[in-house]
Amino acid sequence: MPNAGRTLAGALVATTTLVLGIVPTAGAGAVDDATLTPRTDFVVQPLRPDGSTPPPPANGEKIPNIDSVKATVRTYYGATGTGIAHKTSSPYISEITALQQDVLDALPDPAPRPDLAVVLDVDDTLLWTYDMVDAAMHFHVDPEVRDEEWVQPGRFPAVPGMVDFVAEVSDRGYDVYALSERSPAQEEATLANLAAAGYAGFTRDTVLTGSRAAQSLVELKAGLRAGLEAQGTTIVLNVGDQYADLLGGNAEETVKLPNPTYYRPSPNIEGAPTSDADLVLPTEFEMAANGASGRTTPGDRIPNVDNVLAEIRAYYGAVNGIADQQSSPYLTQMTAFAKRWKQKLTDVCARGMRKGLRPAVVFDADDTTLMTYDMEDAAMEFNYSTTLQNVWVQESRFPATPRMPGVVAAAAKAGCTIVGLTGRNNAQRVATLDNLARWYHDARGNPYFRSAHYFTKWTSSDTPPAHVDCTVDGNPAGCSSLDFKASTRRLLQERGMRIVANFGDQFSDLIGGSSARPVKLPNPTYYLP
């Protein structure tokens, strides 16, 4: 961890998956890098109707990496690195305009009788919130900021193609209504925003809002539709980007628009149609780590950001962004992981010492020896900041990665040299060693990580060391952390060390050989190619 900006770049990843902690035992450098690739198949359960989170996977590697999810979403929306969606061409625009055409092809022209209506949700059905959700809020929506800086000023553009879609539906003789969970206090701003976005004909009588007090989202929307039907209107079509927009009946047909950027769970109403059971998100997903799947994957086949974040937090037992340090699926996994590797390292280090091989074990820093979760979630809300990261580093604020002090101690006691190898830069070296010394030391307080065997990356103003081969990652245009780490392991072995194991939470910590055993720790909170 971390490189400045922490962007996802490079060639498409392969699809082979390395099972956590199960690695080849071939000689140094003999491990095939093609096996060191992120998994691409996932099962993600949506939030329950009451908003609670289903049990997460016991293995963190089975949780979609949130950086990869965001990269996939941005590819799907044709979004820039700053989170601004492309307004004229993207996989999202292609999918949603095709859906609009399919609906128009099936909708009788003209309307076969009076008092037939099409009902549409507002946010991400009529008005497009993507730039707010990504660029302004980084997928962490603040209701107050949303209201004051986006809803009231009317800053949302129209969802691509929907202005023409609504006009065509109206021209065919159907009444058009907008139903929204926006509050009555936001009604005037919503009407003005719809007009500014290009919609004609919406009035206070056709844009219906309601208070969510003491009722669920489904109850609100179904109640508004029931009110229209009580006035003699037949709703032939209900369109929304959330299944909660569609549940509860009172519409002959429903159309779900794609939206992987957030998820609104809601209990259904009593007496809802049995067909509502089909109105659910998929749970099985295929996703490449680098975001490329967004070019070809339908929007609702991308893991939903809200559901993935909920799963990650449940895995770490996090409350308000702070991981549970006493009990969580992550701690359970790390306990089993540490038990296995303490014994393995005790055996292999002792064997190396008997053979006079100068055995060594290499450890990455972030989320291998030092746990960054609270910074990533509570402090950054999964929106990485190099400035804030440096504050945490310089103040040595990170706890030890659970159970890893025992792993390091076992290797040291069995005779292995403890080597630290991190993408943190030289200006963070002293603070990192100080942070490690708090958690990684022998009974007399002597630190296991020592300056002579601790390697940090150069700063942007430094020249890379002569031993670094900047082509290891296949990109000669620059020197990556992968280049630095692989080259440094090679240098250590050239100097006579035998690296019996290399521990890291990123596959880029492990690729490049010069280690008998690459060992991957779980980390769904960020991805470094």
Per-segment meaning from a language model:
Residues P114-T129, P359-T372, G420:
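Asp-based phosphoryl-transfer active-site loop
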Residues T7-T15, V19-L120, G271-F363:
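Non-catalytic pre-domain segments flanking phosphatase-related domains
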Residues M1-G5:
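N-terminal secretory signal peptides that target proteins for export/translocation
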Residues D134-P153, D377-E395:
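A solvent-exposed, charged loop/short amphipathic helix patch at secondary-structure junctions
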Residues D147-Y177, P184-A185, Q389-V419, N426-R429:
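Short, acidic loop-to-helix structural element flanking the phosphoryl-transfer center
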Residues D32-D41, S68, S183, E187-A292, ...:
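C-terminal cap/substrate-recognition subdomain and adjoining C-terminal extension
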Residues P110-V118, Y174-E181, T206, V236, ...:
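Surface-exposed patches in mature extracellular/periplasmic domains of secreted proteins
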Residues D102, A106-P110, T129, V133, ...:
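Structured segments of extracytoplasmic/periplasmic soluble domains
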